Design a protein with these regions (language model features):
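Short, well-structured alpha-helical segments in soluble
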Residues: 52-74, 89-93, 210-219
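Periplasmic-binding protein-like
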Residues: 9-10, 68-80, 99-103, 166-171, ...
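Alpha-helical transmembrane signal-anchor helices
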Residues: 330-374
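Membrane-proximal low-complexity regions enriched in glycine and acidic/polar residues
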Residues: 186, 194-295
Length: 384
């Protein structure tokens, strides 16, 4: 609609990236179905490794400067951790505050570094929580925010491995990796008896991290945070975590983020991830229809405990010892579940064959009886 200010979606990554693409397409489809009237504009920050972090605030300012004055957006949607952090880093300079929604983001953030920060690879920022630290963001009207439960993961791994003395935390060279590492450092202060070993992708390649993993001390448990980009800014898929797994066959691994779950990690306490595109569209329509609503409609995506049943069996663990409920994934499928369709097809075929046999036998005996009666009648007539 030409007379309405547009909705501006600012993505951290290329909109063609799977999670971003699914979220945007679900959002646009649902927004259209709900009768949304605004045009939708998509801008992409194309964030990669953490070495670019000092530039993101300027990129956000540049994007927003294109939509000033009469062209200012009716809503701003921030997709991804980097876009969310970049917005927070420069929101004070914005002349017009429009309603903001964040998604694919988490409650724990780190304030983006300034250009003056030297040695980003060894920079140890403080973890800030938008709820616990009471950040004042009046224009944030809606959001879908993941919360990570590091304490829950430590409780899980200590229940299974009470002799644990060291936790090796793996994080990569991305904003997500740095924020999760900052959260782990903050949460580990609650466990002074545990030693935290940081396996930091800002300082490691996949090859050097594998070498470090081979030399971990006894009574260590690995916590896999995230691994997508290493210090050389090379991108990795699942094969990287397989290489790490092969280097540490005798060390158990857990994950607070679902990375390596199903291949390497035994389990973890992780956000109950779900598709939120449709819910975002409903929120956009609500924000338009209720402009006077000043309440924050923030949907916090809580955590659930998950264990890979194949890994549980492989490591000889008993999920019942955990002090909380747990969801088992990759459970072995029974013969009936695996071949339900074939079993029912075979049963149906058997029933049809039995019915066919019964009908054939009925007509066979009926015909035989009639023939016998005819022969008897013929015999009686001859006698007469």
């Amino acid at each position: 609609s030409k007379d309405k200010n547009p909705i501006l979606i600012i993505c951290s990554y290329n909109p063609a990236a799977h999670q971003t693409s699914v979220t945007i397409s679900d959002y646009m489809e649902e927004y259209g179905k709900l009768g949304g009237q605004r045009d939708i504009i998509i801008e992409n920050m194309n964030c990669k490794s953490f070495s670019e972090a000092p530039l993101w605030s300027g990129m956000m300012t540049q994007i927003l400067s294109k939509y000033q004055g009469e062209k200012h957006p009716g809503q701003i949607i921030l997709l991804g951790q980097e876009a969310w952090a970049a917005y927070l880093s420069q929101r004070d300079s914005m002349q017009i505050k429009v309603p903001v929604m964040c998604s694919l983001a988490s409650s724990n953030i780190v304030i983006l570094p300034k250009d003056t920060v030297k040695n980003l690879d060894s920079w140890m920022p403080e973890s800030v929580d938008i709820f616990a630290d009471h950040m004042d963001i009046p224009e944030l009207e809606s959001g879908f925010i993941n919360q990570y439960d590091i304490e829950g993961n430590i409780r899980m791994l200590r229940t299974f491995y009470p002799k644990t003395e060291h936790i090796a935390f793996i994080s990569d060279n991305t904003y997500g990796g740095v924020t999760m590492q900052a959260l782990v450092r903050k949460e580990m202060e609650k466990f002074p008896d545990l030693d935290l070993i940081l396996m930091d992708g800002r300082k490691h390649t996949i090859y050097t991290i594998v070498e470090e993993l081979r030399h971990l001390p006894e009574n260590t448990v690995i916590m896999v945070g995230t691994w997508r980009v290493d210090m050389n800014e090379g991108y990795f898929m699942r094969n990287a975590t397989y290489a790490m797994m092969e280097a540490t066959p005798a060390i158990p691994a857990f994950t607070p983020s679902s990375v390596s779950l199903g291949s390497w990690a035994i389990g973890g306490v992780l956000p109950d991830y779900r598709k939120v595109g449709k819910e975002m569209a409903q929120e956009s329509v609500r924000m338009d229809s209720q402009p006077g609503d000043t309440a924050k409609h923030l949907s916090v995506i809580g955590c659930k405990a998950v264990l890979d049943s194949r890994k549980v069996k492989e490591w000889g663990l008993n999920p019942k010892v955990l002090p909380f409920d747990v969801q088992l994934i990759n459970q072995p499928v029974s013969f009936y579940q695996q071949y339900t369709y074939q079993i029912w097809s075979a049963c149906a075929l058997f029933v049809i064959l039995v019915l066919g046999l019964c009908i054939s036998l009925f007509y066979y005996f009926r015909t035989k009886r009639l023939r016998d009666e005819l022969l008897k009648s013929e015999k009686d007539l001859r006698v007469a």
